[in-house]
């Protein structure tokens, strides 16, 4: 008598469940990291719009020895007219540049109604005159007589700041 042996082909149900569990674990790590990547890319748009704004502030400072109080003083359009896909406005306030950003859902919670703010402030240093340096994002302890001009209104979570801002 001849007995046929069946060879198992394909995957069993338990093996498939393990594969699905592993994919789920990988996705739970990858999706939040991808969200951080997307928001950092969106913040980068602000730095594309920034050079003419910084130039206007520096030009005003070079001519007057003071910093512009607002967009109009710096000969720039109104804050709401300087926008991009993720930048809703760029406002100058006493020399500081405040960029309002609209970002997609953040891990820390819901986005504020008005958006997140990233402040770029000029730094005055007697040794560096006539040049201006720019301080981005978080407050940094500066050694006297060096001082940052304007108020830091940054509300953007640190993880979304470009590496040169941290």
Where do the PLM segments sit?
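N-terminal alpha-helical signal peptides/signal-anchor transmembrane segments
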Residues: 46-64
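Periplasmic/extracellular, small/polar-rich flexible segments of pilin-like filament-forming proteins
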Residues: 62-166
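Short beta-to-alpha loop/turn elements within the nucleotide-binding domains of ABC transporters
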Residues: 11, 29, 41
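Alpha-helical hydrophobic helix detector
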Residues: 17-30
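Membrane-proximal amphipathic alpha-helices
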Residues: 36-50
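N-terminal leader/signal peptides at the extreme start of proteins
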Residues: 1-14
């Amino acid at each position: 008598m001849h007995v046929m042996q069946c060879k198992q082909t394909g995957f069993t149900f338990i093996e498939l469940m393990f594969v699905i569990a592993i994919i789920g674990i990988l996705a739970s790590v990858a999706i939040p990291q991808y969200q951080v990547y997307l928001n950092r890319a969106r913040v980068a748009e602000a730095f594309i719009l920034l050079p003419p704004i910084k130039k206007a502030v520096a030009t005003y400072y070079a001519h007057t020895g003071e910093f512009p109080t607002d967009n109009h003083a710096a000969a720039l359009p109104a804050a709401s007219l300087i926008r991009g896909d993720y930048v809703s406005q760029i406002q100058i306030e006493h020399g500081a540049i405040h960029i309002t950003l609209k970002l997609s859902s953040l891990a820390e919670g819901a986005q504020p109604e008005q958006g997140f703010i990233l402040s770029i402030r000029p730094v005055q240093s007697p040794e560096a005159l006539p040049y201006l340096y720019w301080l981005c994002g978080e407050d940094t302890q500066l050694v006297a007589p060096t001082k940052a001009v304007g108020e830091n209104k940054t509300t953007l979570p640190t993880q979304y700041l470009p590496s040169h801002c941290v």
